[in-house]
Amino acid sequence: MSEAVLRFTGSGLSFDTRTLWRDLDLDVAPGEFIAVLGPNGSGKTTLLRSVLGQVALTEGDVTANGRIGYIPQQHADDSDTMMLRGRDLVGFGADGGSWGMGLRGLRSRRTRVDAALAEVDATRYANTAVGLLSGGEQQRLRIAQALTRDPSILLCDEPLASLDLTSQQVVVDLLDARRRRARTAVLFVTHELNPVLPFVDRVLYLADGRFRIGTVDEVMNSAALSDLYGSPIEVVRIGGRLVVVGGEDSHHCVEHGYADEAAS
């Protein structure tokens, strides 16, 4: 069995008296696609931040065995990047915050940027201002940015937010192609499970300081979610899509959408 590219061991995270999760043991295998779900404030984004070292766990450990690529949430007011060329945005991933690169470093950087742009079919956007591109085109560039270091695992934070259905499918197909070609694992935080349903190997569902891990069928069923929330939840499959209804706080709505947090 291949060594896990990401491992949570007895991990937990609490803020004051509020626990987001505890006793989480999770091994992410090369090429595995894990969807991270949960309601507003359950800690999905915070989970990714713990992998990035931006938030310290209060219990246990998290270990990444390989390079990490990160696709952050898009924000409508992200004006700092709108005037950049596509190539410049992607180049931030290759730079890694380094300064003073020599000629050899610049050539290597250019090669990696060009390769990443080509991998996501975004070469034609290389010299276009990011602000002139559609949301889907911008997201191609952010995926390319994450790929410049040839990551073993991709952390994706709501990469489908604010995208139309066509652009959502493009993004999901790009990520799936990468994991199949390079065995890059994907940890995918999302409001909507249905767009990625055909690709998901396992679900990590966070809610009320607890969690469930398993296949889609093991987690996304009425009994499992009702137990997790402590209130009646109904899960129905309609035409190959999941519909989740229930919860007095209206965590669920048709086609498994969540009114989730911007920084959960």
Language model: regions and residue ranges:
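H-loop (His-switch) and adjacent beta-strand-loop-beta switch element
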Residues: 202-216
